[in-house]
Regions:
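Extreme N-terminal segment that seeds HTH/winged-HTH DNA-binding domains in transcriptional regulators
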Residues: 1-46
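Short polybasic/polar patches that bind polyanions
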Residues: 24, 42, 59-60, 102
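Beta-hairpin "wing" of winged helix-turn-helix
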Residues: 28, 32, 61-69
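Hydrophobic alpha-helical segments that drive targeting, anchoring, or assembly
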Residues: 38, 47-48, 63-66
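Residues in the helix-turn-helix
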Residues: 50, 57
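Short, structured interface segments
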Residues: 69-75
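All-alpha effector-binding/dimerization core of bacterial HTH-type transcriptional repressors
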Residues: 75-135
């Protein structure tokens, strides 16, 4: 797949699709570092802003992590905790507050699951590490 500047699809979306495909195929394995912004820009002959936007999109999807000065890498598959919902409980998915994101070390774009127990107790869990089970 190549970036087509004449396409109706924005360049950053094309690059995000290309990188996503390489991640999903295993060409960029979990934990591996992606090429730098400059390398991607030069390799695909596109502007650095398009690269930044593509990386931001993949980060919001939870596929990659970025760290200033350290680079960008593919997220490892996370172990999921199985939580059994008790009768009378409810669960919703929502975006975390900045405090929750910091406390749970959540990447941008990762939701939380808020569970309300039958007695009104509230638990907030990372959405990418939680699997809900109905009894």
């Amino acid at each position: 797949m190549r970036i087509d500047p004449r396409s109706h699809t924005p360049i950053y979306i094309q690059l995000a699709d290309l990188l996503r495909e390489k991640i999903e195929s295993g060409e960029f394995a979990p934990g591996s570092t992606l090429p730098s912004e400059l390398q991607l820009s030069q390799e695909h002959q596109i502007g650095r802003e398009s690269v930044r936007m593509a990386v931001a999109l993949l980060r919001s999807e939870g596929l990659i992590r970025t760290s200033r000065g350290r680079g960008t890498w593919v997220r490892e598959a996370l172990q999921r905790e199985h939580i059994e919902l008790t009768p009378g409980s409810s669960a919703i998915a929502r975006m975390p507050s900045s405090r929750e994101r910091r406390e749970m070390d959540l990447d941008e774009g990762v939701p939380v699951i808020e569970i309300r127990g039958p007695k009104g107790e509230v638990y907030v869990l990372p959405g990418d590490q939680t699997e809900l089970i109905r009894p």
